[in-house]
A protein has these predicted regions:
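Sec-dependent bacterial lipoprotein signal peptides
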Residues: 1-24
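Short, proline-enriched alpha-helix->beta-strand connector loops that line the catalytic pocket
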Residues: 126-128, 211-217
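Gly/Ser-rich "nucleophile elbow"/oxyanion-hole loop immediately N-terminal to the catalytic nucleophile
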Residues: 77-83, 137-174
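C-terminal catalytic histidine-bearing segment of alpha/beta-hydrolase fold enzymes
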Residues: 207, 220, 226-286
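Primarily recognizes the serine-hydrolase "nucleophile elbow" in alpha/beta-hydrolase
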Residues: 158-159, 165-211
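A domain-start/cap signature at the N-terminus of enzymes
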Residues: 26-87, 128, 177, 181-186, ...
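Active-site machinery of serine-nucleophile hydrolases
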Residues: 85-87, 91-150
Length: 286
């Protein structure tokens, strides 16, 4: 299998420097970090530790053979030593849509996992390869569809040194809806666990029913979400918890009191007190 290697020093430096340009909102303006458009190389030496932003590379659409979307790549310390690593794929919200080019990939670093990594708030002992694809802003639908998520996951598993039983999915808002759509269509084919934030699960449960419970799922939602009402997650999660054939493996719902369409930063930076990373790593695909 072809394996990705370390980002170039230039790409890492450009990305870190461009952190000053990342937006705090969901609109236009400066597009954030810059990086290398080169193909991923095969690494021969393990990556060193240090600031997480130094192990980031932009992979624009069309720059990596077989990649269905442009994406941002983060590799953990030690990657390249031949040890398979867990994979975490982050699906962003609708406000970060783009064309997958170097110009628009920086939008992904506004919030959540990519923001933590770019701001060097991602600890060295967190072992995930993290890949963050960008949705097509020209697509008819706003959110990724199940087969698009599946295609990216399988690309990642083939091109990186991934522990095949430790593939995890997470998403916010539109990305969470895309994750639910994927889980409804593909259940436990690949994914060992999912963390979904501020996305509705009504369509997913209507499509897949109790089969959704074959994958460990931890959902987070704001109590006063004005975009995706909390009932759109409470109702299907309650139905999922009541399933008996099959009974759910591990499904959880955490509702943040007084929170609107948000909740991702306190979830991903663990300030809300829920260690989602340890929880994910506690599950493996069988």
């Amino acid at each position: 299998m072809a394996r990705s290697a370390r980002p170039t020093a230039l790409a890492a430096a450009q990305l870190a420097a461009a952190g000053l340009l990342v937006l705090a909102g969901c609109g236009g303006g400066s597009e954030g970090p810059r990086g290398s458009e080169a193909e991923p190389e095969r690494g021969s030496e393990p990556l060193p530790g240090g600031p997480s932003s130094e192990r980031v590379t932009l992979r624009p659409a069309g720059s990596v053979e077989g990649a269905p979307l442009g994406y941002i790549e983060y590799l953990p310390p030690g990657y390249g030593d031949g040890t398979p690593r867990p994979l975490l794929v982050f699906l962003h919200g609708g406000g970060e849509n783009g064309d997958g080019s170097q110009r628009t990939l920086g939008r992904l670093s506004k919030l959540g996992v990519p923001m933590l990594i770019q701001n060097d708030d991602w600890p060295d002992d967190r072992p995930f390869i993290v890949l963050m694809p960008q949705f097509d802003e020209e697509a008819v639908q706003e959110c990724l569809l199940a087969d698009e998520v599946d295609s990216f996951l399988r690309f990642a598993m083939d091109h990186y040194d991934v522990g095949q039983s430790r593939v995890y999915l997470t998403g916010v808002s539109c990305g969470a809806i895309g994750a639910w759509d994927y889980l409804a269509a593909h259940a436990d084919e690949v994914v060992a666990g999912a963390v979904v934030i501020a996305g509705h699960a009504t369509d997913a449960f209507a499509q897949a029913g109790c089969e959704l419970g074959r994958v460990p799922i931890w959902a987070f939602h704001g109590e006063v979400d004005s975009i995706v009402p909390v009932t759109y997650i409470e109702t299907p999660m309650k139905e999922l918890e009541e399933c008996t054939d099959p009974a759910p493996v591990d499904v959880r719902l955490t509702v943040y009191p007084g929170v609107d369409h948000d909740g991702w930063n306190e979830t991903y930076d663990l300030s809300a007190g829920h260690d989602i990373y340890a929880w994910l790593l506690g599950h493996e695909h069988r």
